[in-house]
Amino acid sequence: MFRLYFFFNVICIFLAIRSAIGGEVPDATEQKINNFLASGKDSEDLSKRAAAMWFGPRLGKRTIASELHDEMMDEIDDNPLYYSGESPQRVASEIAQGTPYVVLLLTGRVLRQPQPVFYHSTTPRLGRRDASSSNENNSRPPFAPRLGRNLPFSPRLGRSFGAPVVDNFAY
């Protein structure tokens, strides 16, 4: 294992020395500028490209074209999030066709109402309460018990009637 690392390091050092002696290799930006100059296009366009390459990519929120956005939203609204393929019953019947024996796992039907299907465009508005929760009493009790204490509030700070009075403290 040591020999492998040794030969790898020797090869890396050899390549580093060879590239240093061989001359400076232009980076990709310089090559692009040289190719652009050789093509003979406007120098004004070259300065715009060079500035864009110098400052890097544009940061911030990129907007989608309105037509593309509308098409995407229509496609999302047409397909509910829960299931968008063939019905499971149809797929099962196609699989079971032509087989002599089929094992079916049946589940009981749930007697509750089916849940409404939510689409992508219906999102809850955070920070808003619906009308059903506005009728609830959200006020605190007069004294909130802390650390599991269920005793009523006593403003006397630990003193109570009938407790022994401590006058002498042992240090």
Curated annotation (Swiss-Prot):
Residues 23-47, 63-111, 160-171 form a propeptide. The modification Leucine amide is found at L59, L126, L147, L157. GO terms for biological process: neuropeptide signaling pathway; pheromone biosynthetic process. InterPro entries: PBAN, Pyrokinin_CS. Its main location: secreted. Residues 1-22 form the signal peptide. It holds the Pfam family PBAN. Residues 120-151 are annotated as: Disordered. This is PBAN-type neuropeptides. It comes from Aedes aegypti (Yellowfever mosquito).
